């Protein structure tokens, strides 16, 4: 097992020094979802939620979250992101309406963007919940996970189905 990199010689937390790492193009895709009622699905689809356009606001929240990840994840380095894309797709089955969220993040730097993608996916789902909770508080935020990543010393990763 490799040694922990986020502890100093005194056993206290530290931010890892990445100054010797080569800057490369790095990408990450993270996913999340939220299950809503038919009523919420209809209201989102017809832009009838009182707080505004749910998907537009959630998309912007996801982008903002990716940019601010280092403010809420203690050992995360601040990064200059090259791009963040938040997309949505509906999956419907037997009166269940699941909003699928996919976030793609890209940078050119010395560390990966997995945490930025995961944070953005989470914030996007949370924003949908916040905007729709006046209609129904029983929404369920689903699993949030890394789908794939490219670049860096550890190489590429693709989640197995």
UniProtKB/Swiss-Prot annotation:
Signal peptide: none annotated. It catalyses: (8S)-3',8-cyclo-7,8-dihydroguanosine 5'-triphosphate = cyclic pyranopterin phosphate + diphosphate. The active site is at 130. Its EC number is 4.6.1.17. PANTHER family: CYCLIC PYRANOPTERIN MONOPHOSPHATE SYNTHASE, MOLYBDOPTERIN COFACTOR SYNTHESIS PROTEIN A. Homohexamer; trimer of dimers. This is Cyclic pyranopterin monophosphate synthase. It comes from Bacillus cereus (strain AH187). The lineage of its organism: Bacteria, Bacillati, Bacillota, Bacilli, Bacillales.
